């Protein structure tokens, strides 16, 4: 039996110059870590994060919040003053804080919030090495320096934090410190089948607010919009091609059928949510633009290449060969056809895909993930169609407003309902704990397009290379227009419902989110068994997960590839079916 393990997605470290504000700055190094209070005014995350402490009248300052904080500090309510004085620390799990991506987005949120409430000593603790010892040192430092609000990025921190809490008197220290944790892109999974771990999680109930992202929304919009763009390019090219002798025209674009390709670093929802939405976008486009006979015969306008979920994020010879295979394309009737679009959900392997496209000079398009990757790949942005974004900075800023009890004072979002991440959940924050009906609870705030948690970046395709022949417009300009149209059509404009909410197709809606969430719950429980045990799941654990996954197989990834196979969560399903 092949041993499987859950691999993590390392952040892409890109050196950039921080824009510093006049403040007390402390920076030091500890072995593989850097500790700093250098606030930044960059705007990777779309927060309009510019701030001058000597001028609080700028357009991007949350004036209502600044005035409220001043009122609290001058007033007599000590409890509110104490709340404002909670110190925040960002602890990373790999990568630099100035990565022009994930970590930097979070630190932008902390910087903006800190500046607006007048906090000068909030801190980041970045770790260049991902292991238990390094992360434990981070948590020890946070306790020793009395940081009460911890922001932990990187899903691998779930296991690091639980392991640290299980050692010595760390749990007692954590509780005595009145620690509150904001988890970014992860949330502790149910560990009821592992009692020792569940006991620890029960001990810290009320102290965890998770930030997670419905990346399937962005994947859907990107997939649908890219398909429509190809359709319009084809129509544009056809204007210069006369009909054949039968009086018809074949497809002009790419000399025939077009293929899109996605690959991933692992078989868990942090990866496959992107894929799921992407394939649903392709499926929806094809269903709208093809008759039933064409669909039954697999003559889709856009087809998908097989999806490899085993690239494992790390750059090495094996993973490079897998990426090369995806970029180079698959054989159809003896002819190798490269995909027009490549969607890597595999961390640093995006750079490998970009380099391969450049080497082949193939004019293929790359789609990034997590943040606007054109900022990290400035020199190569001309082949980036877009990025499916987690709006991490916006989510983190809202989380801080929620934890500090300041959600009424976010002028950017205008309403408490849009800012308070606990709104509508029945939960409140009282004395530093999330409470529901008098009991402490941890809460996972999972947002999609409507909540401002996900998006699709502006296209940066080279305007000289990629433009329409018969109309004065670049592919990038038209793609951005289609994206806006797609959001409105499927997700709704303003308070209107979109088609995804109206559930108009036969199998319960373009997104049956309830079914989708059940599947993710099962697969993540499966992934948790593997990761926590550091070995293959037991027969009992397989039996626990198997019915959930197999029962949900048919509705998941309902999209046919060019070789007439349906895309499912094959690595898990194959493993379960072949389990001995």
Q: What are the functions of these language-model segments?
A:
Residues 46, 51-53, 57-580:
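A residue-level marker of the well-folded mature domains of exported/periplasmic proteins
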Residues 1-12, 20-75:
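Intrinsically disordered, low-complexity repeat and linker tracts
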